[in-house]
Structures are given as C-alpha cells and as structure tokens.
C-alpha cells in the first residue's frame, strides 16, 4: 500500500477516429512517420471512448500499466516511447522556466490504467484512442502543454488524429525527424451536425494480421501502395477537405468508399496477400451499393479499416431506412433488443421496392450489432475523483 498521497492523479477520455483517407505504411518505423497524409472523422465519446487514469507517487518502485483490467508489459517499445517523450517535454518545459528545480514528479514512477468501452484489436481503432488518451493523460499529469502529435504518434500513428475533435488531417510531413508530421483539425465537430456514423460489428475477434505487421509487408512488397501514396492520395486529401468544407455528402461518400477499396486493394497486392474483409463485409458492400442505386443517389458510404467491421457514413434522415435494410439483410438472432446501440433510431419499415432492389438472401447473425454515433469532440478531462480507475494505492479499483 502507498504510504503517501499521490503527487498527481488525472483521468481523461479520448475518442476513436475513422480514416476516410487511409493511412497504411510507414517511411520510418521508429518515429512512426507515414508514407502519405490521411484524414479522419472523430467519433463521439458518448458511444466510443478510451478512459485512462495516470497516477504519480514517490512510493511507486516501477512504471506499471493495466489495460481493460489486465496488467500489460510496460516495457513494450511504443509505450516506452510515449513515456520517454512526455518526460522529455516535461523536463524541457521545466528547464525553460528560469532554472526551476526539477519537479519531484519527474523522478517518480507512474501507474496507468486504461479501459475501452468497445472491442479491443477488432478493427475499431482501439490503439488510436488508447495512445491518444495515454498521451493526453500523461501530459496533464506531468504538466506538459505542447502539441502532443509526436507523443501519440510514437504509440500508434493514427492516435495523433484522436487528439482533436471533428475532422482531422494527419500531415505526413517531410522532415527526417518527423517534427512536421502532425495532426491538424480541418473542421470542428459542430461543422456537419447531420452527419451520422454507424458501426456494423461483424466480429469482435482479434484479427489474424495486425496493422503493424501488415503495413510493413505492404511497404516492402506492394507497388500499388507506393503508387497510391505518391500519385493518388495528395489529390484525394485536397478533394476530401473540400467535400467536408462544403458538406458535399455524395462526393464525400463516394471518395470514402473508393479510398477504402484502394486500401484493401493494396493489402491484396501485398505478397503474401492480406485480407481483412470477410464474406459478411462483402455482403455489406453490396448492400450499400444496391441501397444507393435504388435511390439514384449516394445516400450511404462504407469504409473498412484493418478488420471486417464496416463503418457507415450517412445523414440523419437516412439512418432509419438504412438500419431497416441492414436488419433485413442480417436479421439479429436472439439479441434483437440489443442489436442497436448508441443514438436512438426511429423504427422504419422496409419498402417492398427497396427489399426487391437489395435482392439479398438474409444472413442471420451476420452483423452482431450496430453502434449509432456522430461526429464528436477531442479528449476530455474528468474532474470527478470517482472517475479514477486507480485507487489511492495506485492499483486498479475493484470492479463495481
């Protein structure tokens, strides 16, 4: 048990982000520098978030970390990189203050606990939210006020995009030291209030090929990936920023789908090939295109990260009808009451015309559940001490 009160205890939350222009591949593995810029949408923390508590105490003999209740190896290189960067920034800040003595917090060890309210390692960008939350929480506990893009990026590249709400660009940068590889907000969460995001959870299983391993293989073997980074992404970044700025949903939706498709094409172009989509993912893709064809307009878009779960973008006036289409194509088993999570959706009947246009044999249980959410803000500080995941002794609180 700790004999002294902790020097500092901070709890924060951070959001998941979903890239609409994908990041895949590093030009520098140690500094986590991407081969192309990317652009993402920050999801609302009311539905998807990571919560992290960091506690500093003179009584701690080593750094320790718990993820979703299980203690993890604090020596993991990316975790160490985040801790090292934050402590370095804290020292620089202290040294710039007219010779202030080194604060005792910098000579102390830190305990960290983090929980996700969504499946970890299932293609739901858990590492992005996790490392963004870690960087943000450590910065608060150590009194660091500088840009945290580099700290979060060293943990997980896309984590730097979770440091902001709304629509966020991760600029690839050109400098060898990565100082210009930073995240920047393109538009705030209030910019497009009608935009909705539906996550169709196909599988919460851990994927066979992790992102880090997959990226490395693609960079080494895929000529399509090199072509994409150099000749396709720059123009798409500019066009996507325009779509967001002008709230041009049909163009936004089409570009989102095309970029997702090209990302997965680079995975297939990798040798040996990588496949993150499964049969249900492909049925969702067909459902989206048939839904749009029925309406004669692009009403819905899909995107897939490195996993089989679909992320759907649409506007609020289309959500109910699209949910009805998904319900028809992938009727829930016994969990009908828990099929829809998140924002409330008004029930809507599926018209006979749309049902005929979908031309799909139902696949019961293909979609486990749907999370309905919207664009949301960046990381938040929780002021209530009851929110801390660690007790006064620096150990995880017992589950309630």
UniProtKB/Swiss-Prot annotation:
Report the EC code(s) recorded for this entry.
Answer: 4.1.1.33
Tissues expressing the protein? Expressed in heart, skeletal muscle, lung, liver, brain, pancreas, kidney and placenta.
Q: Which reactions appear under catalytic activity for this entry?
A: (R)-5-diphosphomevalonate + ATP = isopentenyl diphosphate + ADP + phosphate + CO2
The protein's matches in InterPro entries, at most eight in alphabetical order, are given as: GHMP_kinase_C_sf, Mev_decarb, Mev_diP_decarb, MVD-like_N, Mvd1_C, Ribosomal_Su5_D2-typ_SF, Ribsml_uS5_D2-typ_fold_subgr
UniProt effect for mutating residue 161 to L: In POROK7; uncertain significance
List, in alphabetical order, the GO biological process terms annotated in this UniProt record.
cholesterol biosynthetic process; isopentenyl diphosphate biosynthetic process, mevalonate pathway; isoprenoid biosynthetic process; positive regulation of cell population proliferation
Which coarse location class applies to the principal site listed for this UniProt protein?
cytoplasm
Residues the entry annotates as binding (R)-5-diphosphomevalonate: 23-26, 78, 156-161, 212
- GO molecular-function terms, A-Z: ATP binding; diphosphomevalonate decarboxylase activity; Hsp70 protein binding; protein homodimerization activity
Named in its record, the pathway it takes part in is: Steroid biosynthesis; cholesterol biosynthesis
Q: Keywords for this entry?
A: Acetylation, ATP-binding, Cholesterol biosynthesis, Cholesterol metabolism, Cytoplasm, Disease variant, Lipid biosynthesis, Lipid metabolism, Lyase, Nucleotide-binding, Phosphoprotein, Steroid biosynthesis, Steroid metabolism, Sterol biosynthesis, Sterol metabolism
A Pfam short name: MDD_C
Recorded consequence of changing residue 161 to Q: In POROK7; 1000-fold diminution in diphosphomevalonate decarboxylase activity
**Post-translational modification N-acetylalanine, affected residues:** 2
Q: Where in the cell is it found?
A: Cytoplasm
- As stated in the Swiss-Prot or TrEMBL entry, residues carrying the post-translational modification Phosphoserine are 96
Domain of life per record: Eukaryota
Task: Look up what happens after changing residue 128 to V.
Answer: In POROK7; uncertain significance
Q: What class of enzyme is it?
A: lyase
Outcome following mutation: residue 101 to R: In POROK7; uncertain significance
Function per UniProt: Catalyzes the ATP dependent decarboxylation of (R)-5-diphosphomevalonate to form isopentenyl diphosphate (IPP). Functions in the mevalonate (MVA) pathway leading to isopentenyl diphosphate (IPP), a key precursor for the biosynthesis of isoprenoids and sterol synthesis.
Q: Which disease is it linked to?
A: Porokeratosis 7, multiple types: A form of porokeratosis, a disorder of faulty keratinization characterized by one or more atrophic patches surrounded by a distinctive hyperkeratotic ridgelike border called the cornoid lamella. The keratotic lesions can progress to overt cutaneous neoplasms, typically squamous cell carcinomas. Multiple clinical variants of porokeratosis are recognized, including porokeratosis of Mibelli, linear porokeratosis, disseminated superficial actinic porokeratosis, palmoplantar porokeratosis, and punctate porokeratosis.
Family according to the record: Belongs to the diphosphomevalonate decarboxylase family.
Q: How does it assemble?
A: Homodimer.
Q: What is this protein called?
A: Diphosphomevalonate decarboxylase
Source organism phylogeny:
Eukaryota, Metazoa, Chordata, Craniata, Vertebrata
Gene transcribed to yield this protein: MVD
């Amino acid at each position: 048990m700790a004999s002294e009160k902790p020097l500092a205890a901070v709890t924060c939350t951070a959001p998941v982000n979903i890239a609409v222009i994908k990041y895949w591949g590093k030009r520098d593995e140690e500094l986590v520098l991407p081969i192309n810029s990317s652009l993402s949408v920050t999801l609302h923390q009311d539905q998807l978030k990571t919560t992290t508590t960091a506690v500093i105490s003179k009584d701690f003999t080593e750094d320790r970390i718990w993820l979703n209740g299980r203690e993890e190896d604090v020596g993991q290189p990316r975790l160490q990189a985040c801790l090292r960067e934050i402590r370095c920034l804290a020292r620089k800040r202290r040294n710039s203050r007219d010779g202030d003595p080194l604060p005792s917090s910098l000579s102390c060890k830190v305990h960290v606990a983090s929980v996700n309210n969504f499946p970890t390692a299932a293609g739901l960008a858990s590492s992005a939210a996790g490392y963004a939350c870690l960087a943000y929480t450590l910065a608060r506990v150590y009194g660091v006020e500088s840009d945290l893009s580099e700290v979060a990026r060293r943990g997980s590249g896309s984590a730097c995009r979770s440091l902001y709400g709304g629509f966020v660009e991760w600029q690839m940068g050109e400098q060898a030291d990565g100082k210009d590889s930073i995240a920047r907000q393109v538009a705030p969460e209030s910019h497009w209030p009608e935009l909705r995001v539906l996550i169709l959870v196909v599988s919460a299983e851990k994927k066979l090929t992790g992102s880090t391993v997959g990226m490395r293989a693609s960079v080494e073997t895929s000529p399509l990936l090199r072509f994409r980074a150099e000749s396709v992404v720059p123009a798409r970044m500019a066009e996507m920023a325009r779509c967001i700025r002008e709230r041009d949903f049909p163009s936004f939706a089409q570009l989102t789908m095309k970029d997702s498709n090209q990302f997965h094409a680079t995975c297939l172009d990798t040798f040996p090939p990588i496949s993150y989509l499964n049969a249900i993912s492909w049925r969702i893709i067909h459902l989206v295109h048939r839904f749009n064809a029925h309406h004669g307009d692009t009403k819905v878009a899909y995107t897939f990260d490195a996993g089989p779960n679909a992320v759907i973008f649409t506007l609020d006036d289309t959500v109910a009808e699209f949910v009805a289409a998904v319900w028809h194509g992938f009727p829930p088993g016994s969990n009908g009451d828990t099929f829809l999570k998140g924002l409330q959706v008004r029930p809507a009947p599926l018209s006979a015309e749309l049902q005929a246009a979908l031309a799909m044999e139902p696949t019961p249980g293909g979609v486990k559940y749907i999370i309905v959410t919207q664009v949301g803000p960046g990381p938040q500080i929780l002021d209530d001490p009851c929110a801390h995941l660690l007790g006064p002794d620096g150990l995880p609180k017992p589950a309630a």
